[in-house]
Amino acid sequence: MLKIIMIIALIVVAISMLAMFVRIIKGPTLADRILALDAIGLQLMACIALYSIFIGSEYLLVAILLIGILAFLGTAVFSKYMDKGKVIERDNEHHH
């Protein structure tokens, strides 16, 4: 019974990932695309967690942590880009 529930949960999360891919393509704004990309990262983490429980292995939990860190960094970078128009600010003044 638990395996059937896990499979159904994986299917539901996969369908929601497809909806987020549509949001990335259609937009309409950059903020929508950023949020959809972040949501895909969370959904991917959920899929890996469900699969890890399904196969009874804790080794995939490291992958979940890595994806979470990368999703956070990506969202932070995109947010800074939206706010300032660039990611890396350079100080062009030379102090002698």
From Swiss-Prot:
Membrane topology category: Multi-pass membrane protein
Principal cellular location given in the protein's record: membrane
Disulfide bonds: none
UniProt lineage: Bacteria, Bacillati, Bacillota, Bacilli, Bacillales
Subunit structure: May form a heterooligomeric complex that consists of seven subunits: mnhA1, mnhB1, mnhC1, mnhD1, mnhE1, mnhF1 and mnhG1.
Function: Mnh complex is a Na(+)/H(+) antiporter involved in Na(+) excretion.
PANTHER family assigned to the protein according to its UniProt record, in alphabetical order: NA(+)/H(+) ANTIPORTER SUBUNIT F1 (PTHR34702), NA(+)_H(+) ANTIPORTER SUBUNIT F (PTHR34702:SF1)
GO cellular component: a single term: plasma membrane
GO molecular function term, any single one: sodium:proton antiporter activity
The protein's name in its UniProt record: Na(+)/H(+) antiporter subunit F1
Matches recorded under InterPro entries: MrpF/PhaF-like (IPR007208)
Spans traversing the lipid bilayer: 2-22, 30-50, 53-73
A Pfam cross-reference name: MrpF_PhaF
Designated gene of the protein: mnhF1
Family label: Belongs to the CPA3 antiporters (TC 2.A.63) subunit F family.
Organism field: Staphylococcus haemolyticus (strain JCSC1435)
Keywords, sorted A to Z: Antiport, Cell membrane, Hydrogen ion transport, Ion transport, Membrane, Sodium, Sodium transport, Transmembrane, Transmembrane helix, Transport
